């Protein structure tokens, strides 16, 4: 007992000594107080870390959190907007991405939480075409006429993000209340492009009686209620794999243009991706009507081919084509499009200035050479950097159904095969003498095009009889056009007059009917003129004021007069260097170049 008391006393004295020592920790706290302080600070730091992490994760996953947006007009360019928000690094429609049918709240949330840049959603009115129909815009694609998401709720959520907006209207009754909502939202700033889409015309594989959105009412409401948008007027389309060649026709495209040409807004035309290549002559014409126009390629269940997509890209301005295409095709397409020095998939009816890209865009800087036989062709393919190859075509003496190169026995097919196998930039100029050879030659071109080999500018020339020129033995202009359109229309038309008709030069009686005839064609047209006949007339000036028309001056090699037609030829150059071309010998070309430099 005593021992215990002594020990207890010793312990008590020790604790007292330690307590005195503890008071010296930082000169303020006891050990217990210091430990408690450290634990408390640690808990506070841990709580801050957890809180900040939670806020960051929620902000990232909850698309309803407001994003600060710089001011941007709702009718502004979509690519400019994506550049401004940092979504893309260059102004190229290839890099814009889309989310389809972001209609229900769950799909909308999924779209907002994704990395896509533009949300596309369908708008109708609640209970459309039923006794329960209201004027409340909802997000639903037919046959759905009810939704858990109204347009107002959709806009409230989407406008807190930095996504672009495309609204696809399924009925005219949804348009007015939707535009009222957009106008109201814009009071505080939509700050992103808004695209307004509706199918207003029947398109490929769709009968005329099929219901579409009334175009006149659609456009009138936009101008009245909320004109600050990009308009996306489309065709109602049905793609059928059993009819793969059905496409947008000339009449469909011209009808669309006549319907929208009065609109002041930016216009983007939605085009089915599987039908775009075959309809390209008409679609490219539509694009050429205004710099405000663009195309948006979209797809259904079937995937477009990479070759078809590359064809569209290689024949258009990258700022004017959008690709609403699904993965994995979109990524594959992007990779293929970025390959340097890949062969260009040029449209054979395209502009040779665009193909050859000569210095100063001057047609004189495009080289022309004539193919006389196999040896001359091989020499040109080996030694020349590229240019237009003039190929005179006639019938084989023993085989009238086999077109050959005039002056040799080389079949035209063999000639074309060698040209198409070359990696150099070549244009094809077929100089055809008879109607039979026209059909056979066009058939060879069609075959090459169908197997995806013909990616060269291709011109078809014939002396034709038309207007004041009625000379026995020559094909009529109307029959020439019909034959080309029937067999292979994807060419530049290069008609010329029989030499017997040029005694008085190119008179108005000759030229004006020819221009009128070919003005009806949808292809590019280059009228062929003989240099020695030019000085007898200046009627050629009529041609260069026509859209899609150009002039090609030919100088016969047997004519040694270097100054033949030179005055008119220089006048043609002065009028338009991009739309005047020169199928002339090297000596004559150098002479013109020298004269041009002096001037």
Curated annotation (Swiss-Prot):
Disulfide bonds: none annotated. The chain crosses the membrane at residues 39-59. InterPro entries: Memorin (IPR019356). One of its GO terms (cellular component) is membrane. It is a single-pass membrane protein. It is found in: Membrane. Keywords: Membrane, Transmembrane, Transmembrane helix. Its main location: membrane. It comes from the Eukaryota. Belongs to the menorin family. This is Protein FAM151A. It comes from Danio rerio (Zebrafish). The lineage of its organism: Eukaryota, Metazoa, Chordata, Craniata, Vertebrata.
């Amino acid at each position: 007992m005593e021992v215990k008391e002594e020990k207890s006393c010793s312990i008590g004295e020790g604790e007292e000594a330690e307590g005195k020592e503890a008071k010296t920790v930082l000169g303020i706290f006891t050990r217990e107080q210091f430990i408690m302080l450290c634990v408390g600070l640690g808990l506070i730091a841990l709580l801050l870390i957890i809180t900040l992490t939670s806020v960051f994760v929620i902000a990232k996953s909850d698309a309803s959190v407001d994003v600060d947006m710089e001011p941007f007009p709702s009718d502004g360019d979509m690519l400019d907007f994506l550049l401004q928000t940092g979504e893309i690094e260059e102004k190229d429609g290839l890099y814009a991405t889309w989310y389809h049918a972001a209609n229900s709240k769950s799909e909308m949330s999924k779209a907002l939480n994704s990395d896509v840049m533009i949300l596309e959603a369908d708008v109708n009115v609640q209970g459309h075409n039923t006794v329960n129909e209201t004027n409340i815009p909802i997000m639903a694609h037919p046959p759905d006429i009810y939704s858990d998401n109204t347009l107002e709720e959709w806009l409230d959520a989407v406008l807190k993000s930095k996504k672009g907006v495309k609204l696809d209207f399924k009925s005219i009754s949804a348009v007015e209340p939707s535009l009222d909502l957009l106008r109201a939202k814009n009071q505080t700033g939509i700050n992103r492009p808004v695209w307004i889409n509706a199918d207003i015309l029947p398109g490929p594989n769709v009968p005329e009686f099929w219901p579409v959105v009334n175009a006149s009412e659609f456009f009138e409401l936009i101008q009245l209620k909320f004109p600050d948008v990009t308009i996306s007027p489309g065709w109602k389309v049905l793609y059928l794999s059993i009819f793969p060649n059905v496409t947008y026709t000339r009449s469909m495209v011209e009808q669309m243009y006549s319907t929208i040409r009065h609109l002041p807004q930016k216009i983007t035309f939605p085009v089915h991706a599987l039908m775009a290549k075959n309809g390209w002559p008409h679609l490219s014409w539509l694009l050429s009507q205004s710099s405000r126009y663009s195309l948006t390629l979209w797809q259904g269940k079937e995937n477009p081919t990479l070759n078809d997509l590359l064809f569209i890209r290689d024949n258009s301005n990258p700022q004017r084509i959008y690709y609403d295409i699904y993965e994995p095709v979109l990524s594959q397409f992007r990779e293929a499009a970025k390959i340097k020095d890949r062969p260009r998939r040029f449209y054979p009816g395209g502009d040779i200035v665009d193909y050859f890209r000569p210095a100063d865009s001057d047609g004189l800087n495009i080289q022309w050479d004539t193919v006389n036989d196999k040896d001359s062709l091989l020499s040109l393919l080996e030694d020349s950097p590229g240019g237009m190859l003039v190929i005179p075509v006639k019938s084989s003496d023993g085989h009238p159904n086999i077109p050959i190169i005039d002056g040799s026995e080389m079949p035209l097919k063999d000639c074309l095969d060698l040209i198409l196998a070359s990696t150099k930039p070549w244009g094809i100029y077929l100089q055809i003498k008879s109607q039979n050879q026209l059909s056979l030659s066009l058939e060879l071109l069609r075959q090459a095009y169908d197997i995806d080999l013909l990616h060269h500018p291709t011109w078809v020339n014939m002396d034709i009889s038309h207007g004041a020129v009625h000379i026995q033995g020559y094909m009529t202009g109307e029959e020439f056009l019909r034959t080309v359109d029937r067999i292979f229309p994807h060419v530049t038309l290069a008609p010329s007059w029989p030499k017997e008709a040029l005694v008085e030069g190119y008179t108005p009686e000759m030229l004006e009917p020819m221009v009128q005839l070919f003005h009806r064609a949808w292809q590019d047209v280059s009228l062929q003129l003989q240099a020695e006949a030019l000085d007898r007339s200046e009627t050629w000036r009529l041609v260069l004021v026509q859209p899609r028309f150009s002039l090609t001056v030919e100088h016969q090699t047997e004519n040694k007069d270097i100054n033949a037609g030179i005055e008119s030829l220089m006048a043609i150059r002065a009028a338009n260097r991009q739309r005047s071309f020169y199928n002339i010998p090297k000596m004559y070309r150098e002479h013109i170049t020298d004269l041009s430099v002096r001037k």
